[in-house]
Each structure stands twice: as C-alpha cells, then as structure tokens.
C-alpha cells in the first residue's frame, strides 16, 4: 500500500445514506469503517471495539451513545468509552477509545482521510461559485481496480459503443487529436471533441468539446462550456474498497437549466450501469504500467498520460 494514497481524501458516503440511530458500514482500502450521526454531527470510526475486537457495526445507538453488542461498552461521540457495564465503578482509561478519522462535509457528501498527515482536499473551481447547482450520485460498486475505473472515465472512444444514443452514436465514432499536458499536479486534456445525442440528460445533441482533469490518482473530472456563460462539470471519485473493488461517487455541477436532482441521479445511474460490466470484464484486473502490454492508439493519449502519471508517483496499488 502506498502511504501517499492514504493521505488523500475519499468519499465515504452521501449524507442521505446516514440515518439517525443507525450504523452505516463501509470498506475503504480493506478496512472496515462505520459511519453514524447525532443530529448534524457525523462520526466516522474504525469498526472495532477496543475491548475484544468485536465489530461495532453489530451494536446500537441511543441518545448519541454507541453501544457494543458484545459486552455493552458504550462510546460517546468523541469515540471515548464512557461506560463498562461489567465494572461500572472503575475509572475508564483514556486509551479505552475507538480509532476515529478526519471528516470533511461538502456538497452533500462526506470525505474521510485515513492518515494523520493529509494531502490537500481536491477543490474543484466550480465548488466555490454560488450559481452552480450540485447533485451527488452513487455509490456505484464496481469489481475493478480504482485505476481501471478512472481510466474508463477518461476514455471517450467508448462513448459510441457503450453509451450509444446517449454519449455517442456508432456512425460517428472518430475522435480527433486533442491536447494533453501532464505535471506533478495531475493531467489536463483539452479540445476533446465527440458527437453526442444526449450528453447530460438535456436531450441537446451536437459536437461537444470537453476538457478533462486528473486531480489526484483516484479523482478526475470532465467539463464543457455549453455556451459563453453556461458550464457543465462532472467529478468522478473512486474510493477503493480493495485492490480489485471500487466504490464510485459522482458530483454533477451545472449553472444552467433546472433539472430535478432525481433526473440527474437517474441519468448518472443509467450511464454508470452501462460502464460497470465493461470495466469489470477487463483483463488483467490491475492496470498495466508497461505500455507494451496493450496496443494503444492516438485516441488513448489521456489514458497513456494517466498511466505515466501513476508510474511517476510510484503508485503500486491497483496496477501491475
């Protein structure tokens, strides 16, 4: 495992997934994580009772206290044990606590960080512009490595075939040459042209010019200017469950139109469902770093740049 990856922020859930007095279980980098809330406060902990290692996800919540199902140990919202039923009169040591994680709440999503030393949060420019509506979608579970999922997101040549009559049409599959710039901060591809009959659920067809960004190993985005003052952005977040399984969330940002949140989510659900069986079928499961293992062509420029970016950062997770 690359320590560098653990320093990044990962989407653990949408806020709507967390219900009062219920424990939500997730998996991140093969670690079991629980999420629960009391009113507006969200707690994200390791799924492990400090006493005898039982899963706290089997426990219960009442009045802002999480109770372990095994011996009834009770933990407050600061992850500190406040009651040991078998010895109610003892002074509870400070080490009787659950490991908790840093949390960022933004755009109706919850991010966590598994490291004490964190990288900067990926802050998309449109996040801070008040005229943009935002809709979070997911989770989408994909039995594929995180790099495979990201590379598919960056690939436009599959649009006419996997997303026919939505993101592309089979009689217009050509991808013109486009520009790619790589740096230590990521990748930027511009002037990516593709004909699309219904690219964002608005049923407006025509040639679309995209720009793509890789912000960190497992965060990428695409954007397009619909008109001079109208812009569409889709951010793609991959949270690794394991080296060969991923949890995906997307964030749609638009400063035009008045689409219902459900319509946006339904469209994203539909598009992602088309991608899943394709990406899950790819072999090898781990993304090859040796570019000679597969045959690449000009339209693969951004995926080649992505593989070189991972290699330059010495990423070994999800790759071969």
Question: Where are the language model's segments positioned?
Answer:
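Basic/polar N-terminal segments that are highly enriched at the extreme N-terminus
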Residues: 1-4, 318-320
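C-terminal catalytic domain of Rieske-type non-heme iron oxygenases
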Residues: 118-320
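Rieske [2Fe-2S] iron-sulfur-binding domain
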Residues: 4, 11-129, 134
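Short beta-strand or tight-loop elements
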Residues: 8-10, 31, 99, 174-176, ...
């Amino acid at each position: 495992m690359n320590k560098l990856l653990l320093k990044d922020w990962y989407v653990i859930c949408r806020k709507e997934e967390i219900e009062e007095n219920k424990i939500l279980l997730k998996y991140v980098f093969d670690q079991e994580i629980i999420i629960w809330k009391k009113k507006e406060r969200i707690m994200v902990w390791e799924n492990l009772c400090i006493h005898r290692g039982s899963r706290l996800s089997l426990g219960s919540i009442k009045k802002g206290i999480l109770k372990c199902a095994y011996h009834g140990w009770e933990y407050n919202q600061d992850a500190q044990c406040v009651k040991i039923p078998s010895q109610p009169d003892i002074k509870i040591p400070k080490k009787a606590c659950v490991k908790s994680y840093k949390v960022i709440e933004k755009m109706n999503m919850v991010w966590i960080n598994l490291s004490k030393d964190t990288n900067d949060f990926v802050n998309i420019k449109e996040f801070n512009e008040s005229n943009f509506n935002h809709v979070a979608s997911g989770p989408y579970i994909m039995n594929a490595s995180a790099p495979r999922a990201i590379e598919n997101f960056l690939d436009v040549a599959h649009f006419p075939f996997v997303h026919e009559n939505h993101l592309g049409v089979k009689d217009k599959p050509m991808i013109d040459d486009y520009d790619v710039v790589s740096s230590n901060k990521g990748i930027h591809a511009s002037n990516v042209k593709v004909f699309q009959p219904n690219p964002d659920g608005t049923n407006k067809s025509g040639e679309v010019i995209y720009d793509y960004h890789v912000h960190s190993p497992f965060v990428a985005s695409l954007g397009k200017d619909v008109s001079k003052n109208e812009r569409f952005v889709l951010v793609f977040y991959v949270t690794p469950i394991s080296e060969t399984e991923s949890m995906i969330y997307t964030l749609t940002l638009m400063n035009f139109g008045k689409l219902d949140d459900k319509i946006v989510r339904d469209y994203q659900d539909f598009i992602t469902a088309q991608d899943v069986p394709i990406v899950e079928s790819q072999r090898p499961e781990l993304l090859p770093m040796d570019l000679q293992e597969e045959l690449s062509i000009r339209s693969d420029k951004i995926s080649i740049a992505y593989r070189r970016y991972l290699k330059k950062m010495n990423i070994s997770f999800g790759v071969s």
